[in-house]
Amino acid sequence: MGRKVHPIGFRLGYIKDWQSKWFAEGETYTKQLHEDIELRKLISKELQSAGVSRIEIERSANKIEISVYTAKPGIVIGKRGTNVDTLKSALEKKTGKKIKLNIKEISQPELDAQLVAESIGEQITKRVSYKRAMKQAVQRAMRLGAQGVKIRCSGRLAGAEMARVHEEAEGRVPRHTLRADIDYAQVHAHTTYGRIGVKVWIYKGDVFPNQSAKASVEQPATAPASERRERAPRRNSNASA
């Protein structure tokens, strides 16, 4: 099942958190859910060149707080904050509610699965060798401290007549382990030959929810040699015979 289940959905409530944080019932839930989808589409469209990884939405009675995680905060904010003000006005006009925008920078985009997948997809669209793009992405992630990376591309790769799957991997990616911090993303690259699917798994290490990581990985100390029980002398079977 580790190959089938979504790596982030599998860990929700344990080491991963939801990207929409609010509660509603009945028709209100449906309305707010569709509103979240439209807000994410609008933000992704307006900030297409800003390297947006994820968008988190929190709601209160008359206010919506949106956190945008991006690799290029300068593009999002704009000169003297003009871009972010324009985006905020567009979101308030669409929802009719007060919007608070938080722009958060991603310091290491090479370790963000969404940004890595989008980068590979963009290179494939520009007819860069898919093998080269995948290998470079794996090497960069491992160089920056990832414990494991796996990238899979599927479709009519390099314009082949028959669709196939190509995979590049390094390190380990434990998909069954709940405490394993795995970042996952899936994007599509549109080429003249059809659509290419790109999936990225990045394993960043283990997360221990109820205790510090340092305490959990410490091994029990070995008893000193003076306190160890002496081993009984080996019985000589030849002598007894």
Swiss-Prot record:
A single BP term in Gene Ontology: translation
GO MF terms, alphabetically ordered: mRNA binding; rRNA binding; structural constituent of ribosome
Chain intervals for the UniProt region annotation (Disordered): 212-241
Domain KH type-2 intervals: 39-107
Domain of life according to the entry: Bacteria
InterPro entries: KH_dom, KH_dom-like_a/b, KH_dom_type_2, KH_sf_prok-type, Ribosomal_S3_C_sf, Ribosomal_uS3_bac-typ, Ribosomal_uS3_C, Ribosomal_uS3_CS
Entry keyword set: Ribonucleoprotein, Ribosomal protein, RNA-binding, rRNA-binding
Gene3D superfamilies: 3.30.300.20, Ribosomal protein S3, C-terminal domain (3.30.1140.32)
Residue pairs linked by disulfide bridges in the UniProt entry: none
Tagged with keyword RNA-binding: yes
Cellular component GO terms, alphabetical: cytosolic small ribosomal subunit
Record bears the keyword Amino-acid biosynthesis: no
Assembly: Part of the 30S ribosomal subunit. Forms a tight complex with proteins S10 and S14.
Family: Belongs to the universal ribosomal protein uS3 family.
Database matches in NCBIfam families: rpsC_bact (TIGR01009)
PANTHER family: 30S/40S RIBOSOMAL PROTEIN S3, SMALL RIBOSOMAL SUBUNIT PROTEIN US3C
Protein role: Binds the lower part of the 30S subunit head. Binds mRNA in the 70S ribosome, positioning it for translation.
Protein name: Small ribosomal subunit protein uS3
Source organism (scientific name): Chloroflexus aggregans (strain MD-66 / DSM 9485)
